[in-house]
Amino acid sequence: MVAVGVAGVALLWPLLAALVPGCASDLVTPVQEQVKPESSLLRPKVMIAIVARNAAHSLPYYLGCIDRLDYPKERIAIWAATDHNVDNTTAMLREWLKSAQHVYHYVEWRPMEEPRSYTDEWGPKHWPPSRFNHLMKLRQAALKAARERWADYILFVDSDNLLTNPRVLKLMMAENLTLVAPMLESRSLYSNFWCGITPQGYYKRTPDYQPIREWKRLGCFPVPMVHSTFLLDLRRESSRDLAFYPPHPDYSWAFDDIMVFAFSARQAGVQMYVCNREHYGFLPVPLKAQQSVEDESENFIHTITEALIDHDIEPSGHLYLSPSLQDTMGFDEIFLINLKRRLDRRTRMLKTMTSLGLQPTLTNAVDGKALNTSQLQALGIEMMPGYKDPYSGRVLTRGEIGCFLSHHSIWTQVIERSLQKILILEDDVRFEPRFKRRLQAIMDDISRTQLNWDLMYLPPPTPKKIETPSTSNIYRMK
């Protein structure tokens, strides 16, 4: 037996490596491949709860906003219920669910065809105890379904709320709060939160509300009440104790769904928050109990016109909507003045006019920025010596001259075509609530009183004569 020392082993190893090809490579550990990064996490699972009653007027735009949420549809479940309808809500919601269900993770549908009203209600806008009771049961059923399906969040959105910010879901989740509402805006100070609450659970005025509602203070604020639209994080342990129905055993406030839920949150130790860091959407001002579905529809039209000012909203593409009826309200023409380069305003105004049921005649405005001195001279336009704007004290700008020429071209058409009565709208007009009804009432009053008029500024309600030294037939509607 031959003994080989350590030195011999050291010499033998290179010799073996040279004599046996591949020996060294088989024994040496290969270099590790580059490690691939981990993939991103899937978005949390969300259930959106839709409870609709007599909402055929609002569903197309409401569902259009749901469609355009910037969130993976396969991570969203839809829970939808409707009941006690006198309009087309059930058929419309069913049509949307059938068409859209393939893009969502899961859809649950709870229609109730009959009865069409509650036995103890005065009308469709009245809230008797039976209606509150039924609504709370529906919302509790939605909450139960979300928990059973292991949803991470549930989003409650009233069927007349317009979520115009597509990122609202992501933004609210990023706040990392158990119960949070995006602040919604309306034509008044009304919104979907309270800053104060009385010992009896009713709304209480506080100095904190208006600065938040008017975006003078920005952030997320603890409040005693949120309603209409809010996001609940079901991953939080405290969320297990939240309930819409039945009311908490210690509950003694009025029988009202939002008050019952606010009390439940208080007892569960869940703080409600409202956020106004961005503009998230709109909601209509509530109507009175004696008002009708038609009043509600008219009220919602104004919500649409306000939303269209800064947002490009559309009805849901999953619904077939017959063309809306448009008319000129008895005017020979409704002229809409628009600068050709302001396509954004033209698009907004045409959508607004469609929602109002008005048929406009588009008129290209004279662009004051394109006017020069030689063009004005060629048109025979001269500034009156010493004239200054009565409000600003300055001479007229080219833009104001262009505005005048735009109107002048319409007046010329009136004479040439022998038009008797026209309405002129500029593309930055903002409509008042119930615009058509109020304008029709004004025109009826004028006809009844046989008012001799040439020009009126619109709106609003009661006529007040403008004192001018040269013209007696000009009125401003105030």
Question: Where do the protein language model's features map onto the residues?
Answer:
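N-terminal signal peptide
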Residues: 13-34
